[in-house]
Amino acid sequence: MNSQELKKRQENIRNFSIIAHIDHGKSTLADRILEKTETVSSREMQAQLLDSMDLERERGITIKLNAIELNYKAKNGQTYIFHLIDTPGHVDFTYEVSRSLAACEGAVLVVDAAQGIEAQTLANVYLALDNDLEILPVINKIDLPAADPERVRQEIEDVIGLDASEAVLASAKSGIGIEDILEQIVEKVPAPSGDVDQPLQALIFDSVYDAYRGVILQVRVVNGMVKPGDTIQMMSNGKTFDVTEVGIFTPKAIGRNFLATGDVGYIAASIKTVADTRVGDTVTLATNPAAEPLHGYKQMNPMVFAGIYPIESNKYNDLREALEKLQLNDASLQFEPETSQALGFGFRCGFLGLLHMDVIQERLEREFNIDLIMTAPSVVYHVNTTDGDMLEVSNPSEFPDPTKVDSIEEPYVKAQIMVPQEFVGAVMELAQRKRGDFVTMDYIDDNRVNVIYHIPLAEIVFDFFDKLKSSTRGYASFDYEIAEYRRSQLVKMDILLNGDKVDALSFIVHRAFAYERGKLIVEKLKKIIPRQQFEVPIQAAIGQKIVARSDIKALRKNVLAKCYGGDVSRKRKLLEKQKAGKKRMKAIGSVEVPQEAFLSVLSMDDESKK
């Protein structure tokens, strides 16, 4: 194709993504669009086609972004090239959403006709507006008995401020309104800007590792073009690679002769090491490099940290490789090696939130067959020492000596909770119990309320989301962003078994709840840790002060079994001998801590308050 033909082709390209709250029908709508444009034959069609991970299908959520090329013949007789970039809806995967949106010019906003706007819909809309995208509202599930499209149309105008007069009424399940959506994409989403005659600039928005072809980059070409045989260069580190293949996904990978301005596709270039490519980097040609890189993404900082250890210590290197491969595919995962006296060698990992942590753990266990122990999640605390230093601490075992601590600050989040009016009391009670500060409350319509609180992140990472869902019968939707660090009365609590600290069981807790938490955890461990041949004290301590204690009674053999009657001194001698043996055992004996003990620390957070 010459330059003129490529420019003509570029005018007919439309790049868009679909944004929605969880369960508002985003993946189903993507399925219908694939069917309507005949991208996938009816034989290959299956529900949630773009959710390629087993985990995504089982949980019914989208975790990874996916990019697909479709051809659509519009009513005006022209054929358009659509690039549909599927995005996750959950708050933990906002980073994936922001990457998807950077590769688009338009976004289809799907809102459930019965439920209306939810907290995460808002969060994703603001991301789209930040990227200057054209937003097309779609009111989905209009065939539900509880659907009220007019109320939702009004909500879109009032809450988000979008003109919803032309919003498409659709039902992705029944296939109603799909063609109207496609026509609106043609009319309203602008063609990609950019010049095919300029030096190549392509934004890497994702990458996957292939055992045969190395790292495969998913890119959006902003300027210029790339074809097999070219030598590409990474603009962040200057490394060069020879392109072996370029192509598109339909969802299957299909090779092409070139990728030109406006295209979304993949580049394979025999990139062997995972570290050579970074999501958000710009690819250019080594022979004619671009003057400057594209504006990438803001780096996401992990919010929740936990230790991951292999149950079998010889799997340590396998775990490292698995984490490196996951990091390639999930740029927001961070990890570094750490050791624990109780658990051996492992990694300290940083996650965006609890669902993210859960998903990473499941992917490690499923895709790489590694059995893991996870320690209790913690957040990043700012510890101001008496020397005037400020330490960032994410691991309780790294906390300095209490005598050297001047003050501790913890991260607070701005939590936005949308909930039906009748559950406002339950939400406020929960937020207060989690040390939340009330900020404001707005009525979205007659029935739904948007409540905003400042809550410590440490309280949210435990089980806030589960408690919120159960106290509102699943009707609440929740979104949060980091607001600020505030001073708090926090202490580090150590758990001692038989007088020895178990580093993996340490945690940070607010002083007001310290006694309660310590007592609860000691009682719980007493039930879980098996009885030994000697008595084992379990203690919860803050510094040198013991705040709770419970003893596991010793197992004892009946040494008097073979004494039938007889002299009492004989019995006493046997009992004294047993007692001396137990004493010696207690002095040198160590206690095995079962894995359930570590998990129980996670789940024990609020049991006392049920």
Curated annotation (Swiss-Prot):
Keywords: Cell membrane, GTP-binding, Hydrolase, Membrane, Nucleotide-binding, Protein biosynthesis. It catalyses: GTP + H2O = GDP + phosphate + H(+). Residues 11-193 form the tr-type G domain. SUPFAM superfamilies: EF-G C-terminal domain-like, P-loop containing nucleoside triphosphate hydrolases, Translation proteins. GO terms for molecular function: GTP binding; GTPase activity; ribosome binding; translation elongation factor activity. GTP binds at D23, H24, G25, K26, S27, T28, N140, K141, I142, D143. GO terms for cellular component: plasma membrane. PANTHER family: TRANSLATION FACTOR GUF1 HOMOLOG, CHLOROPLASTIC (PTHR43512:SF4), TRANSLATION FACTOR GUF1-RELATED (PTHR43512). Belongs to the TRAFAC class translation factor GTPase superfamily. Classic translation factor GTPase family. LepA subfamily. Required for accurate and efficient protein synthesis under certain stress conditions. May act as a fidelity factor of the translation reaction, by catalyzing a one-codon backward translocation of tRNAs on improperly translocated ribosomes. Back-translocation proceeds from a post-translocation (POST) complex to a pre-translocation (PRE) complex, thus giving elongation factor G a second chance to translocate the tRNAs correctly. Binds to ribosomes in a GTP-dependent manner. This is Elongation factor 4. The gene is lepA.
